[in-house]
C-alpha cells in the first residue's frame, strides 16, 4: 500500500509539471478597455511585453539629404519608380534600404556588380515592385496604416526575406484514410490551437467570407458549416497572436458580430485584411515567375504576407514608430485618384463611433511600454 502511494505521488507530480508547461508564468496584468465586469480587457505579461518591445525597436533615420541638386533620372539609367527624387535623396534612400533589407549582402543583393542599371537579377525586379507596394500603402491605405505608414524595415527587420511569411501548407502526411482536414496539429499559425492550420489561403490570399455568426435566434438562413466556423476562428487566433492582443481588442465581449458594439480597432482590421489581400494578389503573385524555387512553397506559390509579417507580436508594427515620415521616397509623388480598396466597410461600423461601448484605454501595465492599448489604432471617424 505504501509502495503504491510512493509510486502515485511522483506520477502525479510529473503529470502536473507537464500540464503546467502549457501555462504562462505569472504575473499577468489586466488593462480595462471598456465597461467594468464585462471582460472588455487586455491581458499582458510584463515580462513578455518587455521582450516584445525590445524586439520591435525602430532604427534611427538617416540624416536628411541636402535639398536641390540634379534629378536622379538625369544621372542614372533605368530608374523607373524613384525617378521623381533628387540624386541626394535617391542615394540616401538606397543606403537606408540596404540597411533595412540586406545589411550583410550590401548593394549587390539587388544590383548586378558593375552594372547597376541591369535588370538581370531577380531581386532588383522584386525590389522595384516592393517600392511600388510601400508607396501605395503609405499613400492609398491610410484606413489601415494611418499617418504611421510603413517602410521596408517594417517587414524585413534586416533580413532579405521577412521572417514571417507564409505559403499554402499541405499539412503532414496522413497514413490513415481519414484526414483531419488540417486540424489538431497545434500549429503556430493558429496559436497552437486545434483549429485548421492554414487560415491564410482562404482569407488572406483568397477572399472567402469570414463572418459565420447568424443574426437571428434560430439558425434559419445561416448555412455556414462547423468547418467554416473553425477556419474563421483559426484566422482570429492568427490575428490575435500576430498583434499580441485579446479578441476584445476588436470585438465587444457580449456580441462579437455586431459592428455597432465593436471597438474602433475592428474597422482598422477590416481594412487591414483587404490590404493584405491586395498585397498578395496584386504585388506578390505577379512576381511568381521571376522568383526562384527557394522563394516558393511546396505548391509553387510565392512567399506571401500576413498580419505577423509586419506586426510581429505588437498591436502596431514597431509599436507605432513613425519611420516612414522621414523618407519622402516612400510616398507617391501625387495622391492617387482612388484608393485600391473598392469595398466600403460595413455600414453599421460608421455608427460604431458613438455607439461602441468602449472607453479610452488605460496605459499598459509596464512603464517602458505605456502604449500597447493606450495608443490604440485610429478610430473609424479618422478613416
From Swiss-Prot:
The residues that the entry says bind heme 3 are 236, 247, 250-251
Q: Does the keyword Magnesium apply?
A: no
**Residues involved in heme 2 binding:** 130, 152, 155-156
Lineage, opening ranks: Bacteria, Pseudomonadati, Pseudomonadota, Gammaproteobacteria, Chromatiales
Give the start-end ranges of region Disordered.
335-383
| Molecular function, one GO term | heme binding
**Organism annotation:** Allochromatium vinosum (strain ATCC 17899 / DSM 180 / NBRC 103801 / NCIMB 10441 / D)
Matches recorded under InterPro entries: Multihaem_cyt_PRC_cyt_su-like, Multihaem_cyt_sf, Photosyn_RC_cyt_c-su
Q: Where is the signal peptide?
A: 1-22
Q: Where is the lipid attached (S-diacylglycerol cysteine)?
A: 23
**What gene does the UniProt entry assign to this protein?**
pufC
Q: Would the keyword Signal turn up in this protein's UniProt record?
A: yes
Subunit comment: Component of the photosynthetic reaction center composed of protein subunits L (PufL), M (PufM), H (PuhA) and cytochrome C (PufC). The reaction center interacts with light-harvesting antenna complex LH1.
Pfam families in UniProt: CytoC_RC
Q: What is this protein called?
A: Photosynthetic reaction center cytochrome c subunit
Q: Which GO cellular component term is one of those annotated?
A: plasma membrane light-harvesting complex
Amino acid at each position: 500500500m505504501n509502495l503504491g502511494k510512493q509510486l502515485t505521488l511522483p506520477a502525479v507530480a510529473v503529470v502536473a509539471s507537464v500540464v503546467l508547461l502549457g501555462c504562462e508564468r505569472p504575473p499577468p496584468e489586466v488593462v480595462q478597455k471598456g465597461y467594468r465586469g464585462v471582460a472588455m480587457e487586455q491581458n499582458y505579461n510584463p515580462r513578455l511585453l518587455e521582450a516584445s518591445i525590445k524586439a520591435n525597436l525602430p532604427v534611427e533615420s538617416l540624416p536628411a539629404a541636402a535639398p536641390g541638386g540634379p534629378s536622379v533620372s538625369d544621372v542614372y539609367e533605368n530608374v523607373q519608380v524613384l525617378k521623381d527624387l533628387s540624386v541626394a535623396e535617391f542615394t540616401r534612400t538606397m543606403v537606408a534600404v540596404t540597411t533595412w533589407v540586406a545589411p550583410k549582402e550590401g548593394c549587390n543583393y539587388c544590383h548586378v556588380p558593375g552594372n547597376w542599371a541591369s535588370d538581370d537579377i531577380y531581386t532588383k525586379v522584386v525590389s522595384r515592385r516592393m517600392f511600388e507596394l510601400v508607396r501605395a500603402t503609405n499613400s492609398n491605405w491610410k484606413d489601415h496604416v494611418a499617418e504611421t505608414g510603413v517602410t521596408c524595415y517594417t517587414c524585413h527587420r534586416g533580413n532579405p526575406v521577412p521572417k514571417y511569411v507564409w505559403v499554402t501548407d499541405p499539412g503532414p502526411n496522413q497514413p490513415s484514410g481519414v484526414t483531419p482536414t488540417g486540424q489538431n496539429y497545434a500549429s503556430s499559425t493558429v496559436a497552437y490551437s486545434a483549429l485548421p492550420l492554414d487560415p491564410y489561403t482562404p482569407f488572406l490570399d483568397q477572399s472567402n467570407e469570414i463572418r459565420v455568426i447568424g443574426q437571428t435566434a434560430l439558425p434559419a438562413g445561416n448555412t455556414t458549416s462547423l468547418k467554416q466556423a473553425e477556419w474563421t476562428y483559426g484566422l482570429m487566433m492568427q490575428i490575435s497572436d500576430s498583434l499580441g492582443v485579446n479578441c476584445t481588442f476588436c470585438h465587444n465581449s457580449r456580441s462579437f458580430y455586431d459592428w455597432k458594439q465593436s471597438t474602433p480597432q475592428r474597422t482598422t482590421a477590416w481594412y487591414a485584411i483587404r490590404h493584405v489581400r491586395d498585397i498578395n494578389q496584386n504585388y506578390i503573385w505577379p512576381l511568381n515567375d521571376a522568383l526562384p524555387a527557394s522563394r516558393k512553397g511546396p505548391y509553387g506559390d510565392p512567399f506571401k504576407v500576413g498580419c505577423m509579417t509586419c506586426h510581429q507580436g505588437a498591436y502596431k508594427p514597431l509599436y507605432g514608430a513613425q519611420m516612414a515620415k522621414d523618407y519622402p521616397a516612400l510616398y507617391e509623388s501625387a495622391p492617387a485618384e482612388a484608393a485600391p480598396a473598392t469595398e466600403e466597410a460595413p455600414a453599421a461600423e460608421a455608427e460604431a463611433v458613438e455607439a461602441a461601448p468602449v472607453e479610452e484605454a488605460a496605459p499598459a501595465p509596464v512603464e517602458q511600454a505605456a502604449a500597447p492599448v493606450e495608443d490604440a489604432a485610429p478610430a473609424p471617424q479618422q478613416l
